[in-house]
Amino acid sequence: MARIITVGKASSKYSVIIAKNTLTKANLLSHIKTKNKVLIVTDSGVPKKYLNEVKEILKNKKKYYVHVLEKGEKSKSFSSYITIQEKLADLKFDRSDCMIALGGGVVGDITGFCAATFLRGIDFIQIPTTLLSQVDSSVGGKTAINIKQGKNLIGSFNNPSLVLINSKFLETLSEKEFNSGLGEVVKYAFIGNKKLYKLLKDNSESIKNRQLKILEEVIEESIKTKSKIVTEDEKESGIRAILNFGHTFGHAIEAFNKYKNITHGEAVIIGMVI
């Protein structure tokens, strides 16, 4: 049975659906039934079978297009942003159309920012494929790109209209990417979710072995923690700053390593220790 969490205030609330497989016609098509065209943004690191699943659902139902970014933080750039915006313009997208972010945090961030700024805002859907993006970046509405002076310096707050979390995607993650996501999970346990802390402590082997039912509970508790905070403080003017625990040093560590050899989650873990 799917787990459903509602995030945000009445004027901007959206649903997060968590299950082994949320990529169904019922979930996706019912949400975009009034949309005319769809641009799927993904990257070269996302298994093609996931993209094919989305395309199969949209086939014969919606006019869709695909934009594939190069895998990695370097794609969260002004150049990639302009390329996507020009593609939307060339395809004559308007406010009756939407975007789908199929990938990790980089894909979600740049897609959300493009959606926020094209025609001053079109809808977008998050389909996160990594643990880190499932528990963190797909929820809360932060979208951004990087510039040479720093990470996430150009961006906006833009909530998705829907988040579909497939726990089965975690089966294909590398060990390094999976552990990176756990860094953000541990953060949520440390900033006040006692149930999540106990869940992690009591089920460490099951989590390590990627038992999906346990992982779905871990994801749910992580998102509940974030949801409560971002609903109260949508624009990071107060309590939301607690979500940056570990990130001040973490971002510096990532930048020092030129975003190579160390993942975001690993950097956050080190940042929390510091």
Model-derived features: where do they sit?
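Phosphate-handling active-site elements
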Residues: 90-96, 119-126, 255-266
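Short glycine-rich anion-binding loops that position phosphate/pyrophosphate groups of nucleotides
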Residues: 44-46, 104-107
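ATP/NTP phosphate-donor binding region
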Residues: 1-98
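Glycine-rich beta-strand-to-loop/alpha-helix junction loops that act as flexible
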Residues: 71-72, 102-104, 245-246
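Active-site segments that bind and position negatively charged phosphate/pyrophosphate groups
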Residues: 198, 202-274
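A glycine/threonine-rich phosphate-anchoring loop and its flanking beta-alpha core
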Residues: 8, 15-17, 23, 113-203
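Short glycine/serine/threonine-rich phosphate/pyrophosphate-binding segments
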Residues: 106-113, 134, 251-252
